[in-house]
Every structure is written in structure tokens, then in C-alpha cells.
């Protein structure tokens, strides 16, 4: 007897709910209250309580959605229908429902169906003890599960329907078939052709084809971003003068004419009294305001395809060129599995012929792969660890293909995945780095070359390893030295190489280091849980250096630098200022955090807490107090080394803090001042050490981070070009760092904390070839900075604002800015050799036509406009993947 079936066509997709999900205007909550009705399956007219809960929150709690439907042997008669209808009555008791165990069954379905609007609005949460009565498949149930009622249709219909939503593991079938057929010498071309065709239908390979997954631009966030500048008010230049300069500059540089600046740089000190960032819209650039979305990172437990199987298949000889091509293209375009290609040096090496032959389409698909990895870096932020799929070791980072980078059209490079509209980027008038050249875009060095360059950087000899024998268990090298060493070639090398377009020699590279890194420290990050272990490691480094240099320990000097960060709760501060408990106006403190009187007031509070803790610290240290390195623990921090931070304690609140006494043999280096049970002030001391010697080219700066994972600190570094480290064996790099080394462009910068001027840091790395993309408001401060800070103005050899066009956009290798020893010699240590530069370096810069001509020359069979397809659209959105290009590329080269 037939039954009434639900019409599957009525199940409309809600495109606003996906892996990339629009943030709901309502606050989703998982209800934990007792059931309102005796019937656990009943829904009132309001619908499901889960309908406004974000998908990612539901996914954290539930793995499946279950369908409650009729058994296939259900007899459609009036009596049975009346019994089934009990599931839709609010007063039905559980015993009435569970008595139908022989008529009703539970079917496990993919969680993916929660994205269907009708199911989302009709799903209920039911306890396991009730569901077990209908669990005829004996699946393992959680204590509570999501259930949707389809009591008008039978089990077989439901199972046929959900086949469309199950991730058909055709790739695993393909892999196993190829391995089996290769072993036994079986060749079934028809089967292979059908399998390749079916691979393209796997959901895991189609994520970027969905337009709703691609609306993830950061135009608004980029446009409203503000620099954290404390020193700008001290630059002593009238706003009218800087505005006059900006007006003059717009008249000089035509590219700025389409961008109207706001009336003046915002006064962060007056209008932003709460300590929050100003997010006002100051740009007239027009673009569509897209929805804010959520990007879900890939869970390793959801990976249905084994990485080793893919590797074995691609490095074997059992695939035809066509099969290998399509498999590589599908994996690159997959959000879930792109790292199987890019982050695997064995695979990259084995498919080098495919990459070379089909490079234009590989370029296009790699953009989606790199976007997937970069977004995961941004989502995890300081929670990144070495084993994350988007973290590259140097062996893998040195293998991916290199593509030309043209700042005039950056989206043609797959490593540039900044989802900002081209109008807002305005790279021709931004803080771009050195002009790029095809012959100087050579990727990243391998580990052998890295170690030689590191030796050269530290000691002046690529053969002398002064860290040989060091204990690397709890330390890494990071920071500016990585930007000098990791890129295989830097266009600035052309100023120092004798042979045109030849690889730079170690002697020439040493000259390059002297020019751009003479004052650079070698940053050593340590993750010791105990401060005593940290200090012992500093002494160990000092001993190792002396031993490897063959000098006395006394010739290696160690200086300590003690700093104090004072985190202040803004709400309590405002309250205490209003009540008169603190003798300063709240706004006055906000505007004058660096003033001596303000620092002195809070420093006095620190002294009181420090005195109390030192009574205990001295007892714990005992005789170690006679060692200057340990005495630093109880020494008071000088007022000049104090940084006051208001409303920023949350910035570090999610970090594992190794400074607590329990982690430091009872020693206290962090103190709290509380108001009842609420923290009013946190005083956090930090000690770092400078190790220096006349025998060293650069001094070491050794500091301690607050977490076991190095990326908890390094992942938060200001600029992408320094988000990498060396652990004595290999380097680890984040995607944003690799992009910086491939393009000499920093796609973002992160919140600057402390006393360092962010513009000084941005300009320092620009001098080394790396540009940083700023918005209009930030550019105004940068231009102001250049013309106010004397040494910076001298470095550009600027006389007046008439030469302002020299400061923005990509700079020629021969630009005066890149000759600091010539124009600001006072910034260099005495004893360095006199500056000398190659007069006319033989270097060809990339222009608008360079990339097009390159591909036309190397791939004449491709259509003229084929290489204009990019991952990022001009509006900043991701362009949905055009899968037909994969077929077109193959056909064009093989027919």
C-alpha cells in the first residue's frame, strides 16, 4: 500500500546559511530549559528554537541531523495515521510515542541538510533515551540530537533522498582502483574516464563554486582601520600645513584625483574617549556593501580522504597525464584538500611537469587554495600551531611555484589574496615596496641556503655557525632577520651584485645586510614555563657563542631590559576619576598616557605591589640574588620603561600566562590591583636580554613568550613578513609570511602595542623592500610622518612637498630611499665600509603588459584573455570558481 510522500522539491535552500554564514541579526542560543510540552517532538507556531542559531555553533555540538520517518512496512490505514498524528500534538506523552517503535524509524543524515530552510525551521532537540526506541540501525547517539519529522514518507524514500547530500567518497574509490589496477596491470579507460568525471561532482571540491561562500571582502574593515599612533601629536606640524601638503600632492599625482580625503586626520585623542577604535566612513570610494560572513576552518576529523593515499597516487606512475592533471586541479580548488598539494614537497616535486605545462590554470586555481589557507590563519590567529595544515615548514615552503607579481594588478598573483577592492587598495599611490622584476621573483630559499645565510647574518661568515651545540628545545629565531634571509632574491640585490642578473654572492649579500640590517637584532623567542629556566638559557646562549667564537665568556656581554606594562580597566578608571579617588580627569589620562605625571602616578601603585612581592621573591632566589641576571627579577622597573595600556587587557587575556607564580617557582612578576573581585590594574613585568660582542655582526635580543606555542606570539607580529621562525632544524612560516616573501607586499598589519611607532616599523621594512598596504586615513599619517621626521625626510632626499610623488607607489631600485648609508650615514655604526652602489643595475621592471606577454610567449595555445581570470574580483569579493576553465585549459594544450 502506498503512502503519502513529502515533495522533496519543496525543500528550498536558504543560501544565507552555509559554511560561510551570514551573521544572524538575532542572537542564537542553544536552549537548555526543560521541555515546555510533554511531547518532545512538538513545535509550536514559533518554529524551531534552533532556527537563529549559527550553523557553526550547531556544528560544534551535533555531528548529524536525524530524520524520523515511517518504516517501509508501515500500513497506511486510519488507525495508524491517528497514532502517527500523536507526534504533532503538544500533550502527547512519551509512552504513547515510543509504543510506535515498530512503525517509526530514525535515519541518520549528513549535518549538511541543516542548511535547508524548512528543516532548519522545523528541527527539534530530543534526548537520547527517547530516540533509542526508534534507533533500529543501532547508531551511536549523543545525549541530545537534532531531529526533523518526515512522518508522511517512508524510510526508503528518505534514504534515496539523502544520497544526494552524502559526500560520495569517489576519490577514495578512484585512488584504490588506480593502485589496484596498476599493481595487476589492469587498464579500463572507460572506467577511468567516468571516475574522473564523477570526482568533479564531489561536494568537497565545489565549495568555491557557491557564490554565497565568496562574499567575504573586508572593504569596510579595511576602510575604517586606524593606526595606533601615540607620537603623532608630538610631531609639531599644524594640521593646516599637512592638509596643504595633501592638496598639493593630489594635484601632482593624478591617481589621487578620484579619491577625496576627509577634512583632516581624525583626532583619536579627543573623539575616541572610550578607547575603542573609530570606525567612521571617511572614503568616497564606491563599492557594494556585502554581508558579514563566517568562515569555518577545516576539521581534521572531517577529512574523508587520506593524505598519504593522495601522495602515494601522485608520486606513483599509475596515473596518465590527464588523470594527474584533473586530480591536481580538483585538489587545488578544494577548500578541504588544497594543502595535500601545496604543503607537500614530495607532491609538488612529482607534479612539476603538470605545473609547468598548465601553469596558467594552476595560477588561477592556486588562488582559491591560498585563500583557504590564509583565511584559516586569520581565523585561528594566535591559536596557530606547527601541525596546522596552513603552517609550512621550509622544505615545503621552498617548493610551490613562483608567479610574477605586478602591483598594478596584484590579483593576477595567486599568493595575493587580500579581499579588498582595487579602488581601496590604490597600490600605485600606497606604501608599496621596491619595484618588482621577473628575474628577481625566485621564491624562498631551502634549508641549506637558509643556514648559510643565517651564519653570514650573525657572524659575517656563511661557514661559521656560532650557535652550534645550542639547546633549541625552547627557543627559536624570528623577527627581521627572517625577512633578510628567506627570499631567494630581492630586487635590492641588484644594487650590490657585480654580475647582472646573477645570484648574489655571500660577499655581496653581506654588503646588502650592512645596508639594510646594520641595526637589526637577532630576535630569539623562548617558551620556558619557568623564568629561572629562561635565565639559565640566556646564560647558555652566551656560553655557546663564546665557545664557538673561541673567546672568553667575558667578551660576550649581556644586558637586561626590564619593561612594565600597566593594563587598566577603563570602566573602573572612569569611575574612580569621576569620584575623585584618582586625581586626574579620565579624558586627560587617555590623552596623556605617556606624560611623566601620569606614568609616575601609576608607577607609584606598582612600587607598592612590587615591595610586597619582593619579600617573597628574595627568599625564593636565595644566593642567586648575587647574580645580576637573577637580581633583575626583584629590581624595580624604571618609569621610562613603563607603558600604560587602557582597554587592552583582553588583547592578551586568552593567552596561557607563564608569568604566574605557580609556573615560576613561586616568583611573582605579575601583580594585580583589584576593586572588590574585579581587576582594576594588572602590572606585568617583562625581562629580555641583549647579548652583544665586537665579534658579532648583530646583537641577540632574547625574550620570553607567554605560551608554549611560538605562533601564539609570532602569529600576532605586526607585519606578515616577520611571521616565521627557525627552530634550529627548519623554519615554519604562515601563509601571510610566504605571500610577503613571494610579492614583497604585506597584506595586513596587526594591532601595535607598546611604545613603537607603527609608521616607523612600516617604513623600516619598506626600506628593506617590503611594502604595506594602508587605507586613505593611514596614508595621510604616513605622508605626514615622512615630512616631519627629519631622518625619514633625508632618506628620501626630499627638499619640499613638490617631490612628494617620490614617496608613494612602488619605488625604483635606484631611488634615494634605498641608499640609507649615503643619505643618513649618522644612523649607521662607525667602522662600516663606505657606501657603494651599482650605478645602472640591469633590471627589467614588471609593467601592465609583462605578465600577458610572458604567458603568450610560453603558452601560445591559450586564449588571449585566459589569464585575466583571478580569484579576487575588482570589488574585493572572491569570484566563484569557473570549473569550465579546467576543461578549457586541458583542451587548448592537447587538441
Swiss-Prot record:
Domain of life: Viruses
Chain spans, region Disordered: 257-283
Biased composition range(s): Low complexity: 268-283
Annotated protein name in UniProt: Uncharacterized protein R338
Species of origin: Acanthamoeba polyphaga mimivirus (APMV)
